Amino acid sequence: MPVLIESIGNLERRLTFSVPEDRLESHVDERLREIARTARINGFRAGKVPAKVIGQRFGEKVRAEVLDSLLRETLDSAIRAHSLRLAGAARIDHANEGGLNFVATFEVVPDFGEIDVSKLGVVRRTAKVTDVDIDQMIENLRLQRRTWRVAEHGAQVGYLVALETWSQAGDERLPIEGVEAGSTILGSGVMFEQIERGLEGLSKGDENVLDVTFPDDWRVMQLAGKAVQVHVKVIEVSEPVLLEVNEEFIKSFGVKSGKLEDFRADIRANLERELKGALVSHLRREVGEQLIAAYAHVEMPPRLVEKEARLMLAKQIEQIRLSGRDPTGIPDDAHIGFMDAACKRVLVGLLVGEIAGRNRLRLDPMRVTETLHLIASTYEEPEEVFQMYRNDPKLMEGVQSLVMEEQVIEWIADRAQKTEQVLSFQEAIQQ
């Protein structure tokens, strides 16, 4: 039968086609003959099994495998012949039960018309890792491994304060009876800023009453938006003891030489990797937002958007589960809340693919290798991780997709109207 294409929606198509029976039977016979040459069945010598026995033993499975292969080959040929560009996988059903006529339903990529990226305005950030950033990271590492000793003087920023508190908000006392025990490192922001400031200079046994006004969105509902008297009593004040940056300290971070220059070089490499990731992520968001603004009027394939929304919901459910919470109360239609974000993500993805195709952008294998080395360098056995990625098609597909997207994003940014924004390392990674 001839291939029949029908439009059943703005972006949905139905394609009716058939697999030639003579071609199917020819391929099945050929495959069964291949099996017969090596098949081992009890009672027969290898390669001497009768064709009838081979057909009885393997015929049904082989026919299903060959039909699936020919079905997809025939469908792909029809799609190419009619210049159809699919947005997602096709759903294939039998047109007649048990026959060789099939119906494929799928969505197509929308027509974006002319794509002129030179009209887009992109803010491109730049930043560098400096010696000051490396010094700060070393200080952070020292802080991570600090110990504490009882202080003989009042609390300062960076000191650990153990305390008891109770609050009076109008006629309401919190807690109703007794006190709440807790601790905070001054300047860490664990407690409300006004409370931490009120603890500065206090020593063990000191008490104070602090007049605090909590913001409307404060996490404790009874205190939110209220002027409160917070009664504090200091139980203990401890000062930090920082380790010396010596050979032992440096080796504890995997720097075998124990030398400071090697330690700083490792830190610089890590910070530069973090910075690159932050700059690339920002550029991806920046270009994505500009593409969304310019092409928001283009209709997106509804089934593809719904699929993306369900994937986003599934990811959130997994995050809830990993955090130890129970996601079973989430309703079945919760994906609807992700539809807007999913539509934008699909729009950017299709546009990136369209731009790559129209401009014949090709995946840079050298960049893929560099990305693999970058990923592997974050592990203790980088060469093993590198080879693991190289030998796993799914992992490689993910890396290649990421690299291709980065290439297209940079291609767009290079041709858009650019505004350069120079930031410090800290500004770049925090925004």
UniProtKB/Swiss-Prot annotation:
Cellular compartments annotated: Cytoplasm
Protein family per UniProt: Belongs to the FKBP-type PPIase family. Tig subfamily.
Reaction catalysed by this enzyme: [protein]-peptidylproline (omega=180) = [protein]-peptidylproline (omega=0)
EC number: 5.2.1.8
Function: Involved in protein export. Acts as a chaperone by maintaining the newly synthesized protein in an open conformation. Functions as a peptidyl-prolyl cis-trans isomerase.
Matching Pfam families: Trigger_C, Trigger_N
Record-level GO cellular component terms: cytoplasm
Organism: Xylella fastidiosa (strain M12)
UniProt domain comment: Consists of 3 domains; the N-terminus binds the ribosome, the middle domain has PPIase activity, while the C-terminus has intrinsic chaperone activity on its own.
Domain (PPIase FKBP-type): residue spans on this chain: 158-243
Identification of the protein by name: Trigger factor
SUPFAM superfamilies: FKBP-like, Triger factor/SurA peptide-binding domain-like, Trigger factor ribosome-binding domain
Any single GO BP term: protein unfolding
Main location, first listed in the record: cytoplasm
